[in-house]
Amino acid sequence: MKNRKRDTRWLVGVAMFVALQLVLQITGIGLIPLPLIKATTLHIPVILGAVVLGPLAGAILGGVFGICSIWTNTVAPSGLSFAFSPVLAAETAGAAGAVKAVWIAFGCRVMIGVVAGWLWIVLKKVKVNDLIALPVVGVAGAMTNTVLVMGSIYVLLRPEYAALKNVAMEAVLGLVMGVVGTSGVAEAIAAAILVTAVGKALLHVPAFRAKPQMG
């Protein structure tokens, strides 16, 4: 009976975070269009869900983030949308391009929740204070997103990225590092602040005090 009650709370918690992600997506503040990439706030619910519900929930929420990314980049494309939309990628690079886009848009986002969830478990096992652990997990989750996405673009789509930016292939690494050092750092700082503020409050909610689901 206890396990059933805990599982029900877990499912309700996951549904709550999914609903928050959908609100961010529908209102347009989940993925904010910039000239060549879309800045994101959708990683925040993924990280928070991973903290209070565990890595499995984090992976599910990361998958929802990925689906939102694919949808947005397909129906409202910007310069780099071919890297996040298997539909657009398939038009220019066939099935191989579609697979690459699925990994970048979906797979990398699943990893946000996995990394954040397991890092939180490790930090709590070694008894790190919440006020330290929460911002660390926030930064790690945000940087997992930025580094995996931009790193995958560099490894898998370097020629296409060079063509988009109208630069030589040798210049792509510098451009990728520029994105990581600007929008990536900004997203990490925002994640540290928001995950700490909201996460601290959520950890006082009785429903989130139970042992999180690990897989």
Predicted segments with their positions:
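Loop-helix junctions at membrane interfaces
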Residues: 1-215
